[in-house]
C-alpha cells in the first residue's frame, strides 16, 4: 500500500484577478482564522505558507500585534515558511534574481526563528530554470515540488 500525504496550504498570488489591496485583506482574514484555529486545535498539525516569506511581512503590516503568536507557530513547526522571499515564476527571472530571492527568504526566516521549509517549491511556474537543482543544492535543499510547465 502506498502512503499519501495531504498538506494543508495556500497558494497565494499577491495580486492576480483582484487589486493587491483586496487580495491583501482576504489574506489577513485567512491568517487571522488560521492562527486562531491552530491555537485552539492542537490536532491541526501544520500549514504550508506557499513557500514565500513575504507573506509574513504582508500579514504583520496590518497585524503587528500578532507577531509573537505567528512566530510561536513557526518555531513550533506548525506553520511552514520559505524558502523563497516571493513565489516567482523562476523561468522568467534571471538566475541572479532567483539566488537573491532565496537569500532574502532565508534571511527573513531567520528573523522568525530560523525554521524554513527545505523544499524547492515551484507550484505555479510556467517552466523551470535549468539551474534549479544547482541553486537548491547550494542552499542545502534536496527536494523539489513543482507543478505546471513541466
Regions found by a protein language model. Name each.
Residues 1-150:
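Carbohydrate-active enzymes and regulators
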Amino acid at each position: 500500500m502506498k502512503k499519501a500525504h495531504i498538506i494543508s496550504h495556500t497558494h497565494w498570488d499577491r495580486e492576480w484577478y483582484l487589486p493587491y489591496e483586496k487580495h491583501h485583506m482576504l489574506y489577513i482574514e485567512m491568517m487571522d482564522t488560521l492562527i486562531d484555529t491552530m491555537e485552539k486545535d492542537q490536532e491541526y498539525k501544520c500549514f504550508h505558507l506557499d513557500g514565500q516569506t513575504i507573506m509574513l511581512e504582508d500579514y504583520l503590516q496590518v497585524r503587528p500585534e500578532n507577531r509573537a503568536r505567528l512566530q510561536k507557530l513557526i518555531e513550533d513547526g506548525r506553520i511552514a515558511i520559505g524558502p523563497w522571499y516571493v513565489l516567482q515564476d523562476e523561468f522568467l527571472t534571471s538566475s541572479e534574481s532567483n539566488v537573491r530571492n532565496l537569500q532574502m527568504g532565508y534571511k527573513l526566516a531567520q528573523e522568525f526563528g530560523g525554521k524554513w521549509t527545505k523544499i524547492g517549491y515551484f507550484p505555479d511556474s510556467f517552466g523551470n530554470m535549468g539551474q534549479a537543482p544547482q541553486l537548491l543544492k547550494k542552499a542545502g535543499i534536496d527536494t523539489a515540488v513543482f507543478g505546471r510547465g513541466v
